[in-house]
């Protein structure tokens, strides 16, 4: 079976090797693209393909990547990395202080990122031993960048989980909840009170669109007639997440392969795999900093699937084309 991080990677590496051989594409430039969990997958595949199949890639593209090495920590760093996403979402819903709201999003986010790295993370690291005046000061700034009430932030000890944010941000602005995968979407629950939305409102819209489309395509365009259900979301359980070394394996693959470059694409309004977590993952792949010129990062005013917004569909595709043109070897020898 391939229900696990490492078994999934091994299975897909074997499949890719067979495909490349059968289609006689060994001399072709090779790129992997993975979205969400696929980000973990392609990080691991880059190393597996090189070391088990001697297949060297030109590029790895991670779209809204999930980094379970980060998610499983549950520490101060993980918590703090949510704030710039909160800022972007609050800006979209006109929930920020007037001084911030009148600015462009791209001008606000560096301020939120700086506060997160240099003030919020150290404050959370101190836990219950933080000075009370410092705690209040951090809460005030957190409120400024998130649109959340200072008292609410203090009641959560400066550590506001994302599900609380989705429920709380618009509680006093119509009692709406906001989406997880795309926080531009609004919904409402039976009760305005509570700590978690009843459902992911964006999925109701997407499932309503994608399910008829894929079923029509399979039956009418591909002429694949079946009574089997197409699972837009599938119960793939249990999934073995043990021994996840994919982030470091990408570093090893890049160290072995001077031509391997990485592009990361993220949506500002994605609350599942938020853009600042993706940026942090990029920073941590190679702590030495010797390969930082081989990383590219692009963000978009969209959610988890940035290509659902027409402007970002065009821009994200153009960014991939530019990345490919920058990462072609053009006959250079593979050496440092």
Q: Where in this protein do the model-derived segments appear?
A:
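Cap/lid segment of the alpha/beta-hydrolase catalytic domain
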Residues: 1-22
